């Protein structure tokens, strides 16, 4: 399970350090693609395979399904972790997530998310203000 929050800097070549805690669970390489809310999603290969089966089951006749699958797959890339613990994030993905300098890498159960620090701070601030209401709406019993 991926969990926790880490801040690292992305360099001008698009290289970002993946926290050691996550590297152990992700393996030597994993899939990174566009995520929701303006971040990137990173999936271990076994989790990507599960998602891929769900995407294949979507009806090709539905316009939204085709658009979603295209958008997700067109930017998906197999990222290999180098000897320094870094991955190279392509410009398309950096642009999608507005990654320029300071990044936040977040573990979210079966995936990691990569956020620009600015977007992450905005998201956490807004969510903190409504956390109780969100839990109630989702009927989560702690």
From Swiss-Prot:
Annotated localization: Cytoplasm, Nucleoid
MF terms in GO: DNA-binding transcription factor activity; transcription cis-regulatory region binding
A single Gene Ontology CC term: nucleoid
Keywords assigned by UniProt, alphabetized: Cytoplasm, DNA-binding, Repeat, Transcription, Transcription regulation
Gene3D superfamilies xref list: Transcriptional regulator MraZ domain (3.40.1550.20)
All residue ranges annotated as the SpoVT-AbrB domain in the record: 5-47, 76-119
Protein's GO biological process: negative regulation of DNA-templated transcription initiation
SUPFAM superfamilies in UniProt: AbrB/MazE/MraZ-like
UniProt family annotation: Belongs to the MraZ family.
Subunit (UniProt): Forms oligomers.
Protein name in the entry: Transcriptional regulator MraZ
Organism per entry: Limosilactobacillus reuteri (strain DSM 20016) (Lactobacillus reuteri)
């Amino acid at each position: 399970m991926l969990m926790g929050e880490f801040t690292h800097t992305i360099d001008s070549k698009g290289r970002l350090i993946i926290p050691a805690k996550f590297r152990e669970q992700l393996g030597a390489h994993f899939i990174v693609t566009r995520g929701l809310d303006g971040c990137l999603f990173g999936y271990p290969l076994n989790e990507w395979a599960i998602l891929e089966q769900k995407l294949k089951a979507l009806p090709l006749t539905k316009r939204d399904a085709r658009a979603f699958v295209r958008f997700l797959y067109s930017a998906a890339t197999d990222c290999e972790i180098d000897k320094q613990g870094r991955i190279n994030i392509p410009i398309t993905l950096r642009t999608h997530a507005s990654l320029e300098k300071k990044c936040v890498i977040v573990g979210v159960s079966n995936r990691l998310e990569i956020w620009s620090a600015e977007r992450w701070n905005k998201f956490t601030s807004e969510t903190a203000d409504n956390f109780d209401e969100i839990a109630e709406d989702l009927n989560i019993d702690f």
